[in-house]
Amino acid sequence: MPQTNPFHSLVPRKMTDTELARSIRLNIEAELDAINLYAAHIDATDNEDAKAILQHVMDEEREHAALFWELIARLDPEQAAHAKEAVEKYRLITSGASHEAVEAVGKEGAAPSPADVTPEKRLTVGSLRR
């Protein structure tokens, strides 16, 4: 009869928040890998029952990844600050702000002026060629 030691994974000490954040990042990686794997399986079959089950499980993995990301934001305030800056940079980029305005996000005393975000500066196929 196979035996498993229920204590085999216990460590002799508790992790610090920094160590836990590193571990949670690996968990996020595993969740994203699972999402990609399930999406590939969905694309590779015509079996509707399998697709439904895979979609359900994939949605759960998406939720897990999101929950882990929220945990990282609490465990690593520096990464949380970068994430907040990224949201602002995304808003500026997609509204056509200048490169300088985007790069100024997070810098001391730098705030994009309203002139940096105008309808005329919206990205178009033509503007990307320049």
Curated annotation (Swiss-Prot):
Physiological role: Cargo protein of a type 1 encapsulin nanocompartment. May help nucleate Fe atoms in the interior of the encapsulin nanocompartment. Present in about 92 copies/encapsulin nanocompartment.
Subcellular location field: Encapsulin nanocompartment
Binding site for Fe cation 1: E31, E61, H64
GO process terms (BP): intracellular iron ion homeostasis
Superkingdom per UniProt: Bacteria
Chain sites annotated for binding Fe cation 2: E31, E61, H64
The keyword Ribonucleoprotein belongs to this UniProt entry's keyword annotation: no
Signal peptide, first to last residue: none
Transferase as UniProt keyword: no
GO molecular function, one term: metal ion binding
Biotechnology: The encapsulin and a cargo construct (an encB-encC-encD fusion) can be overexpressed in E.coli and in human HEK293T cells. In HEK293T in the presence of 0.5 M ferrous ammonium sulfate nanocompartments can be detected and used as cell markers. Coexpression of this nanocompartment with a larger nanocompartment from Q.thermotolerans (AC A0A0F5HPP7) allows of expression of different sized iron-rich particles. The encapsulin shell proteins are not seen to mix.
Stated family: Belongs to the ferritin-like superfamily.
Renumbered residue ranges of the record's region Probable targeting peptide: 123-130
Pfam families for this protein: EncFtn-like (PF22277)
Renumbered ranges of motif Di-iron-binding motif: 61-64
Full protein name: Encapsulin nanocompartment cargo protein EncC
UniProt keyword list: Encapsulin nanocompartment, Iron, Iron storage, Metal-binding
GO cellular component: encapsulin nanocompartment
Region described as Disordered: spans on this chain: 103-130
InterPro entries listed in its UniProt record: Encapsulin_nc (IPR051429), EncFtn-like (IPR054581), Ferritin-like_SF (IPR009078)
Gene: encC
